[in-house]
């Protein structure tokens, strides 16, 4: 409103307060830049007066939670489909979203904390609802998704899109719970042992499978794991021998991480044996889109190991049919991101986890021609639903330089196939590459050569 109090942080850390008609202000480097953005915001978001002099509300506003590649890709999809300027909420801007003109960014300190998130988001939603008919909230991380599910009753009537219930989320928010769900519905999953903090050392002597093994926290994206620190910390661990595992456990036990550990048999195959399935289920729980991807290379640095660096979109109708039945039996709504691996010993896919949101690599769907945000908006805002779309287009998405793919994709046939495609890069968007942004992105890409040189290993 006209009496809004806006706090401007100057480059020297000083505060300036002023009254301004605009509700939102991006995180500025100085006062002059902020005033420029405020003017741009007013021009872009002030609805034209309706008949009778009252302001007409715009159809919808996307509100994106996060600032990684996923957040940037989501903003790209909305801008491409509807020409709208999303609002991005985060605790800090990461490299993929810095110096971008695709959205407006608002920094909210401690936004990911349970005691801050509900009131902060509620305030934003109430302000936005004055100018927009419908608000779409898109979380780009597990913890934002969890916060939305747990506190959704606070936002009911303000958020147009739906999320799974907190009760359903509880059935798969950790890997041990997800495997119990797989058992219930007859889905394949890797042989698994769950160890409490007290069992971390002793469990290695009672494993029903041999080394090599894969070890993960029960939720590697949970804040309690992300905020703890110990030597050798990774999202996913691969161990060839008992002694390697115990060395990691001794280090972990010195930290304040008290979550469970998941120990699994290693399914034979490298990165290209992995599969990722992105889906959208409408407000009534019917699957409306599915896109399968074959990762051809993963990241290997400790903070990103297990994340996908490049994906070829694929199609597998038998898998689509089976996973659609699974999701609809669950009563799933919204986006899902399912990680799995092809087991060459059985010819079947084993499931690793469901992420109740799209992942960092989900722009591979757009490379295949599928805009997930358009499906969401048509469903929730405009009430348009069509038959389920099953992707069968092959296309390449990559988040690393092509030179890395040529060097580290070891399968000769796959390497040859990659040469036929020009990769889609989510963070390099034509028309959104000012020099300040381009400089950071090129440094970001160049650093990947060092990361792969230092951390890459062959999974056998």
Please name every model-derived segment:
Residues 12-17, 142-144, 218-220:
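Short glycine-rich anion-binding loops that position phosphate/pyrophosphate groups of nucleotides
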Residues 44-164, 201-202, 453-458:
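ATP-binding N-terminal substructure of ATP-dependent carboxylate-amine bond-forming enzymes
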Residues 239-301, 314-321, 342, 348-350:
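Phosphate-binding site of ATP-dependent enzymes
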Residues 327-363:
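Conserved metal-phosphate-binding beta-hairpin within the catalytic cores
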Residues 378-460:
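Peripheral (often C-terminal) accessory segments that flank ATP-dependent C-N-forming ligase machineries
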């Amino acid at each position: 409103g006209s009496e809004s109090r806006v706090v401007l942080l100057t480059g020297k850390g000083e505060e300036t307060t002023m009254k301004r008609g605009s509700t939102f202000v991006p995180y500025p480097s100085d006062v002059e830049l902020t005033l420029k953005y405020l003017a741009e915001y007013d021009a872009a978001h002030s609805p034209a007066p309706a008949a009778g002099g009252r302001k007409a509300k715009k159809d919808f506003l996307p509100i994106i939670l996060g600032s990684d590649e996923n957040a940037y890709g989501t903003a790209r999809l909305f801008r491409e489909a509807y020409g709208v300027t999303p609002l991005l909420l985060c605790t800090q801007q990461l490299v993929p979203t810095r110096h971008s003109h695709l959205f407006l960014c608002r920094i909210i300190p401690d936004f990911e904390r349970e005691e801050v998130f509900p009131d902060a988001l509620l305030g934003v939603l109430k302000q936005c609802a004055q100018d927009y008919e419908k608000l779409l909230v898109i979380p780009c991380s597990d913890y934002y998704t969890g916060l939305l599910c747990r506190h959704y009753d606070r936002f009911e009537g303000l958020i147009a899109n739906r999320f799974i219930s907190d009760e359903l989320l509880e059935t798969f928010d950790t890997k041990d719970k997800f495997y119990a769900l797989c058992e219930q519905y007859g889905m394949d999953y890797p042989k698994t042992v769950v160890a409490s903090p007290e069992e971390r050392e002793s469990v290695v002597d009672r494993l029903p499978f041999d080394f090599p093994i894969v070890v993960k926290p029960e939720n590697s994206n949970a804040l309690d794991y992300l905020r703890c620190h110990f030597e050798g910390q990774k999202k996913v661990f691969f161990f060839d021998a008992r002694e390697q595992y115990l060395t990691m456990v001794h280090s972990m036990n010195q930290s304040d991480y008290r979550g469970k550990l998941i120990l699994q048999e290693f399914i034979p195959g490298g990165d290209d044996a992995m599969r990722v399935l992105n889906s959208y289920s409408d407000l009534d729980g019917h699957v409306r889109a599915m896109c399968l991807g074959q990762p051809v290379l993963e990241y290997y640095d400790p903070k990103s190991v297990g994340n996908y660096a490049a994906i070829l979109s694929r199609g597998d109708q038998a898998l689509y049919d089976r996973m659609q039945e699974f999701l609809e039996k669950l009563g799933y709504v919204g986006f899902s991101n399912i990680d799995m691996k092809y087991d060459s010993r059985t010819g079947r896919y084993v499931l690793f986890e469901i992420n109740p949101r799209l992942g960092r690599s989900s722009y591979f769907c757009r490379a295949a021609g599928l805009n997930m945000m358009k499906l969401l908006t048509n469903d929730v805002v405009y009430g348009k639903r069509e038959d389920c779309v099953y992707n069968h287009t092959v296309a390449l998405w990559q988040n690393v330089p092509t030179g890395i793919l040529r060097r580290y994709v070891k399968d000769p046939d796959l390497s040859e196939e990659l040469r036929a495609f020009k990769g889609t890069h989510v963070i390099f968007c034509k028309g959104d590459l000012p020099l300040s942004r381009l400089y950071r992105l090129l440094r970001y890409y160049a650093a990947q050569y060092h990361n792969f040189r230092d951390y890459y290993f062959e999974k056998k």
